[in-house]
């Protein structure tokens, strides 16, 4: 259960680590503990509610902040001292004032994190989702981005270590990104306060579990008395969905209701390649048998290449 292992690790390390970075298959949907299909935001929120956090604040660049921030400290940003990450040319630090109630600017939300992460009277978790669009690619960061990272790094380091706390889950930051490379190595590598967790695509057991959930959503042709999960080929159907996300499996079910009834094989080909017929099935045996001769008639002086093509085609056929 690859996804389940990832989520269990997140639940275990949130509150122990001061920063948890989640990357990989973060744009998918998942089956939660109640067997409901939810996105990552909903899954994390349910998990954090179970951990009894006082404040759960979610942020992305499009919608800004979601969640009750009435108990949080909100003031103007002040310059902070700290290590700047991925330095290129030095630039002047600039103060930023929180001017938008939705906190859509990264500098605004990072300032909010800095002011509240060290509050020992409340347990607060910040979920910051920028996927691909907050920091520059390739580890190159401009002055504002370096300042944001400085604020974040200082928030993590400034929280006092309390090893005798009665509540083991302390305030923390969860960062969501498609690619871990969006962060400079110096931010998370060899940093004991930062954990990186990669969400994989669903494994075989998880694909079967999803199919059990949405089986009624497939409209397919089967032999009499057979269904998607009660067929002599059920294991093949699950295996062929290797490397699919849960979203793609759900989309495939929707496609089955949009088209005329197809077999699972034809639906798979239509969804993945845009054609419901396998071109290899249309290839006549005689054509495969004589492919070397036919290619030699059209191409001169490429005997070695023709032999390689022949072997590849025969093997695939």
Q: Where does each model-flagged region fall?
A:
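Short, contiguous clusters of charged residues that form electrostatic/catalytic patches at enzyme active sites
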Residues: 150, 154, 307, 311-314
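Dynamic helix-loop-helix/coil hinge segments at AAA+ ATPase domain boundaries and subdomain interfaces
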Residues: 1-5, 276-308
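Generic detector of short, locally flexible boundary/turn motifs and exposed helical patches
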Residues: 138-140, 160-165, 270-274, 292-298
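Hydrophobic transmembrane alpha-helix bundles
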Residues: 167, 210-213, 262-277, 300-305
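Conserved helix-loop functional segments at active or binding sites
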Residues: 216, 220, 297, 311-315
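ATP/nucleotide-binding catalytic cores
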Residues: 1-264
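Alpha-helical lid/collar subdomain of P-loop NTPases
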Residues: 245-285, 289, 293
């Amino acid at each position: 259960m690859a996804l389940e292992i990832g989520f269990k690790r997140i639940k275990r390390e949130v509150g122990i680590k001061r920063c948890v970075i989640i990357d990989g298959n973060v744009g998918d949907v998942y089956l939660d503990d109640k067997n409901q299909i939810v996105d990552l935001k909903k899954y994390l929120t349910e998990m954090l509610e179970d951990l009894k956090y006082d404040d759960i604040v979610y942020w992305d660049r499009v919608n800004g902040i979601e969640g009750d921030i009435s108990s949080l400290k909100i003031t103007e940003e002040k310059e902070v001292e700290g290590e700047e990450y991925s330095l290129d040319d030095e630039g002047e630090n600039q103060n930023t004032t929180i001017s938008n109630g939705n906190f859509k600017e990264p500098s605004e939300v990072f300032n909010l994190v800095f002011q509240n992460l060290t509050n020992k009277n409340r347990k607060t978790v910040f979920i910051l989702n920028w996927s691909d669009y907050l920091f520059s690619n390739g580890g190159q960061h401009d002055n504002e981005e370096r300042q944001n990272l400085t604020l974040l790094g200082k928030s993590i380091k400034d929280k006092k270590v309390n090893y005798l706390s009665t509540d083991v889950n302390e305030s923390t930051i969860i960062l969501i990104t498609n690619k871990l490379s969006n962060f400079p190595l110096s931010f998370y590598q060899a940093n004991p306060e930062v954990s990186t967790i990669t969400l994989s695509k669903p494994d075989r057991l998880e694909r079967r579990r999803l199919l059990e959930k949405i089986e009624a959503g497939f409209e397919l042709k089967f032999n009499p008395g057979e269904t998607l999960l009660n067929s002599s080929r059920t294991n093949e159907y699950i295996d062929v969905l290797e490397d699919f996300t849960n979203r793609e499996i759900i989309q495939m079910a929707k496609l089955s209701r949009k088209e005329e009834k197809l077999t699972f094989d034809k639906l798979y080909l239509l969804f993945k390649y845009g054609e419901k017929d396998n071109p290899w099935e249309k290839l006549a045996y005689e054509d495969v048998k004589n492919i070397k001769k036919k290619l030699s008639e059209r191409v001169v002086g490429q005997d070695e290449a023709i032999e390689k093509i022949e072997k590849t085609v025969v093997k695939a056929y």
